[in-house]
């Protein structure tokens, strides 16, 4: 990596012009900006793990939204908990109530209600290397978000 490709660039060369396109390599939650009508959920979330790529900086493609705190990454457990919540059936139902289209823009995501910081951290404890399946996600959410 970067992979040789004649069609489209798949890496960013660090320079004064590209510096603003990059963020520190931390934990982030990524969501696709567009979903197809056939997809089970409108929002599909994943955790960016900075330990998988040895680089102090990272750039995300324009077709992704990324959750951050003041331009910096999130604590690992919070990122995992947020991704789990975004992948839940509950979040999908609420998102579809407020957004009838397949575009997932940052403004719509900001308007949504989220669990507390403590609840997100507890949710994150249930995510290891892989996101649990849908049924497990929903059970975890139901159990953990009953607690204040």
Residue ranges and their predicted role:
Residues 134-148:
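Flexible helix-coil linker/hinge segments at domain or subdomain boundaries
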Residues 1-131:
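Polybasic, glycine- and aromatic-enriched phosphate-binding surface used to engage nucleic acids
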């Amino acid at each position: 990596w970067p992979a040789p490709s004649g069609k489209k660039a798949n890496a960013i060369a660090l320079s004064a012009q590209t510096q603003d396109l990059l963020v520190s390599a931390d934990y982030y939650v990524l969501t696709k900006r567009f979903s197809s009508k056939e997809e089970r959920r409108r929002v599909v979330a994943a955790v960016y793990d900075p330990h998988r790529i040895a680089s102090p900086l990272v750039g995300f493609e324009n077709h992704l939204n990324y959750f951050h705190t003041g331009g910096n990454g999130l604590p690992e457990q919070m990122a995992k908990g947020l991704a789990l919540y975004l992948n839940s059936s509950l979040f999908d139902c609420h998102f579809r109530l407020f957004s009838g289209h397949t575009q997932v823009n940052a403004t719509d995501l900001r308007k949504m209600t989220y669990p507390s910081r403590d609840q997100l951290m507890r949710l994150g404890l249930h995510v290891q290397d892989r996101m649990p399946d849908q049924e497990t996600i929903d059970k975890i959410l139901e159990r953990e978000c009953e607690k204040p």
